[in-house]
Amino acid sequence: MYCPNCGNPKIQRADNNKPVADFQCNNCDQIFELKSKNGSLGAKIVDGAYSTMIERITSASNPDLFLLQYSENYDITDLTLIPKFFFVPDIIEKRKQLALTAKRAGWVGCNILLCGIPEQCKISVIIKQLIQNRQDVISSYNRIKKLKIDSIDNRGWLLDVLNCVESIDKREFCLKDVYEFTEKLQKKHIHNKNVEAKIRQQLQFIRDKGFIEFLGKGRYRKLF
């Protein structure tokens, strides 16, 4: 597998002293975690310890995530990449701690809520056994890298508003369409006193990064 970040022809298995990574690019030092599942990915995928995951995504050591799907015959069917800068605590679901009778009693795992990550933040590398053009994958990675935000709070707002825009079932939409999600966003961001202003701020950011186009008079067009 090549590196989708820099185009290096082959990424290597990560050293044993990198517990959060399965693969690493020796050219750009990008690290990758691999999760595999038989059949459809569904809305969530099991990951490791909850506390470790939260610590990872709020630090600089979080890897990009490869999601591999395979058939009952162990043939690879799909491969999807989610860059590390689209992970926020809200998409990490805490699982029940293991029972006292379990080998790792009290251990708390987590699930990654894939349904909380906008489709624009997912890059298809293989679709139904069809390998996507390498340069297209690299270009897609470089394009969505424009949405990278270091602040976890602002990153969460970006994903929330981008999810709202994606769920609007038309290519051209207006500001009022996004305001329909105000109540939902207010419940999620209870300390924010001006959700509509935050929506406008995120729409401007998404527009500036080339994912939507402003048509004037509160109207927008999706560019994805």
What are these regions (language model features)?
Residues C3-C6, C25-C28:
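Short cysteine-rich clusters marking metal-coordination/redox-active sites
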Residues R13-D22:
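Short linker/helix segments within small regulatory modules
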Residues D29-G48, T52-P63:
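Short metal-binding segments enriched for Cys and/or His
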Residues L81-D160:
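Long, low-complexity, charged/polar intrinsically disordered regions in eukaryotic proteins
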Residues I152-F173, Q204:
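Positively charged, polyanion-binding regions of nucleic-acid-associated proteins
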Residues D177-Y179:
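A short acidic, leucine-rich amphipathic alpha-helix
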Residues E183-I199:
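Short, positively charged loop/turn segments that connect secondary-structure elements
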Residues A197-F224:
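Charged low-complexity interaction tracts in eukaryotic proteins
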